[in-house]
Amino acid sequence: MDEADARAEFEALQTKIEKADHDYHQKDAPTLSDADYDRLKRRYLALADAFPILAKDGTRVASVGAPAASGFGKVTHAQRMMSLGNAFEDQDVEDFAVGLRRYLGLSSEAPLAFTAEPKIDGLSLSLRYEAGKLVQAATRGDGAVGENVTENARTISDIPQEISGAPEVLEVRGEVYMSHADFEALNARHAETGGKIFANPRNAAAGSLRQLDAEITRARPLRFFAYSWGELSEPLAETQIDAIERLASLGFQTNPLTRCCEQISELLAHYHAIEEQRADLGYDIDGVVYKVNDLSLQERLGFRSTTPRWAIAHKFPAELAWTHLEGIDIQVGRTGALSPVARLHPVTVGGVVVSNATLHNEDYIAGLDSKGAPIRGGKDIRVGDWVQIYRAGDVIPKVADVDLSRRPEGTERYAFPTRCPRCDSPAVREEGDAVRRCSGGLICPAQAVEKLKHFVSRAAFDIEGLGAKQVEQFHSDGWVKEPADIFELQQRYGSGLQQLKNREGWGEKSASALFAAIEDKRRIEFARLIFGLGIRHVGEVAAKDLALHFRTWSALAEAADLARAAALAHRAADEAEIVERQEAQASARRAKISEARNAAVATCAVAPDSQAAWDDLISVDGLGPTVALSLSDAFANPEERAAFDRLIAHLEIIEPDAPADDSPVAGKTVVFTGTLEKMTRAEAKARAEALGAKVSGSVSKKTDILVAGPGAGSKAAKAAELGIQTLDEDGWLDLIGQA
């Protein structure tokens, strides 16, 4: 798979994961099973690992869950509520343990114990106690900010209002759930009274906890299992298992199936034992969680962006179901991507009613992968087919297979549209791209609306009271066609307040609040502005890096303009390479490709200042040519550039703070080589990055410091040749103040 194919799949997965997170965390109505979500997330992370530039461009890798809903007060967690990495096979668990030993520098014989406990399928909750009293309860939200549900949590009998013998500050974390018996009784009562019928216990628990009226929550039979903690004024214990026992002694319910295991074989045996008991537990679980038992090792292992290194969830297998494919709908995204969605006869999969499933792209429908190789045995998907649906997480369900024996006579292969279903512009599939895209740009109403939704999203302008629903309404009414229109709403409509408050769903208070929120966002951080523009491939992380590098809008725009000629030369070279790759014989492929690229570059020679601007763009902390090309295309497109300019006229852009300068290695490029004796390579890398250094795997002119242990070899020789500062391990620790 090349980068273009990987990027197309990565973006599609990102969109699905965002929607699934929203459905699960905000609507309490997941559209996918746990198994499908995990499979999608696993593929997403695998692509990010194989193509690091994608991880930089992506936004969802660095987030957990979904933002807090607007109906509750917001709570900023003192310590983030993290998600968990996933394992799906026994081998994944063994690989997890091997990776931990490698990170910690432990031999295969050294002891490394784990705890194992059921993974409850409910709603995560953080309980804060101060001086023994419950003072706050908050949902996970997006991991950093959750919803204040304190009064509702007080109604749950498993949650103590006061505790004695606890640290002065104690945040207890766990899962709110509903037992099968209580769930069935609740639905039976609702059926009799005409109330809402819940699809599964998880939805019932989440919907019950997130009631604006705490008395409704009180009437719902919610339970709580404690399994972790957040902020502490003093440690609970030295091991995970002892800490859980300490929580139990304080009056919290902990899961009786929690075990401490010395060997991986014990973990796996306990997993399979729990799996066998699953149907008889009386509550929903979707796997088993393993955690390193020694809390000092947990501290050494630390965290990735959204998950702890010291824990993993071993998920149960996906659930499958067969149903009838009633139609194929085409959705158009903000970058013009045409995404096919299967319209299904509703079927229950894993306790969730599924009526739609992703079909990825036209190749997937045709039974081919992006290289033209057959998938599903080459079986295509047709309207009228019986298809197998699976859910492996909380994400959009997927069509896994087709039953040809039940295919109706007279069905025809699906003809993927070559024109946009929304604006009738040509839908073009570029060489090397798995996705067909509408070429209409901003004249396409679907793209315009999706871009506006992106513009007001949480990571972009985050305008209170202006969400996806309001954007659709304003666009349909002709009030907002592009981002600049948002800041002209009140001005252009004169008595805008009066016009808005007279519309359905709006009153004087909500209209005034919206205009105030819009005014508040005229001052905007540069990174949020860049991200909010919705430029293809420019994710949240890439936007921050661009903002830090260029610092002002004028500098970024000037660089994009100046680099345009070089960008076009780069694209011409790539296209020549693709043509030659298709035609070249295998035995001479490399030579011919090189010859074609060099010839293309020679015929597209550009001015030195344009080449320098291009080199500057692609050097932005590993941004790469794909993102740089998208940026160049956006600024060179007359309609988009004009829309940018109209928007900028309304804004005061806040420049990013200068990078931290309080570390002797901040901003420097460091390379580690040879054997390190006082820390593992992974620990050294993590510490250097925490101090603001960039860690590279190879020595170059850009390297500032080489840390060389015994057996440094060629890297030390090259560093000496380039005159690069070289330190031994003790010298490095002394430099960073950890000797």
Swiss-Prot record:
| Residues the record lists as binding NAD(+) | D34, A35, D36, Y37, D38, S83, L84, E117, R140, E175, K291, K315
Q: Name the positions where Zn(2+) binds.
A: C420, C423, C438, C444
Enzyme Commission numbers on file: 6.5.1.2
* Catalytic reaction list: NAD(+) + (deoxyribonucleotide)n-3'-hydroxyl + 5'-phospho-(deoxyribonucleotide)m = (deoxyribonucleotide)n+m + AMP + beta-nicotinamide D-nucleotide
> Tell me, which GO biological process terms does this entry list?
DNA repair; DNA replication
The active site lies at K119 (n6-amp-lysine intermediate)
| Gene Ontology molecular function: any one | metal ion binding
SUPFAM superfamilies assigned: BRCT domain (SSF52113), DNA ligase/mRNA capping enzyme, catalytic domain (SSF56091), Nucleic acid-binding proteins (SSF50249), RuvA domain 2-like (SSF47781)
- Looking at the keywords, is Coiled coil present? no
Q: Which UniProt keywords apply?
A: DNA damage, DNA repair, DNA replication, Ligase, Magnesium, Manganese, Metal-binding, NAD, Zinc
Q: BRCT domain: which residues? A: 660-739
Q: What does this protein do?
A: DNA ligase that catalyzes the formation of phosphodiester linkages between 5'-phosphoryl and 3'-hydroxyl groups in double-stranded DNA using NAD as a coenzyme and as the energy source for the reaction. It is essential for DNA replication and repair of damaged DNA.
Protein name as annotated: DNA ligase
Organism lineage: Bacteria, Pseudomonadati, Pseudomonadota, Alphaproteobacteria, Rhodobacterales
User: What gene makes this protein?
Assistant: ligA
